[in-house]
UniProtKB/Swiss-Prot annotation:
Keywords: Ribonucleoprotein, Ribosomal protein, RNA-binding, rRNA-binding
Protein's name in the database: Small ribosomal subunit protein uS11
Its biological purpose: Located on the platform of the 30S subunit, it bridges several disparate RNA helices of the 16S rRNA. Forms part of the Shine-Dalgarno cleft in the 70S ribosome.
Entry's family note: Belongs to the universal ribosomal protein uS11 family.
PROSITE patterns: RIBOSOMAL_S11
GO cellular component, one term: ribonucleoprotein complex
HAMAP family found in the cross-reference section: Ribosomal_uS11
Name of the coding gene: rpsK
Amino acid sequence: MVKHQTQKKGVKRKQLKNIPSGVVHVKATFNNTIVSITDPAGNVISWASAGKVGYSGSRKSSAFAATVAAQDAAKNAMNSGLKEVEVCLKGTGAGRESAVRALIAAGLVVSVIRDETPVPHNGCRPRKRRRV
């Protein structure tokens, strides 16, 4: 009986590319903050969210959770050689400014801060007013 040899499929490791500049997308919602760091073409280098770094429930919406998420994403991106970034903010959550401050404190040079919050031209009906 002839045994057919099959090649073992190993896990492909992504090679770290040296990317000097990139774009940081910060999406700050009322429930969470998501920080994605991409190269200028839009390919994701690293990402982090308040839930990924260990916060759950109402603590995800805090400014401190956004700070920790931004530091985590920046640290992983700086391993790829990232130095200078543009920041694109989206949303009206608590973690907007604190995420930008954390990026600067992590050692990234912020060249542009852009606000891309989507504003409806009288689109969908908003959710009900909160009564406390």
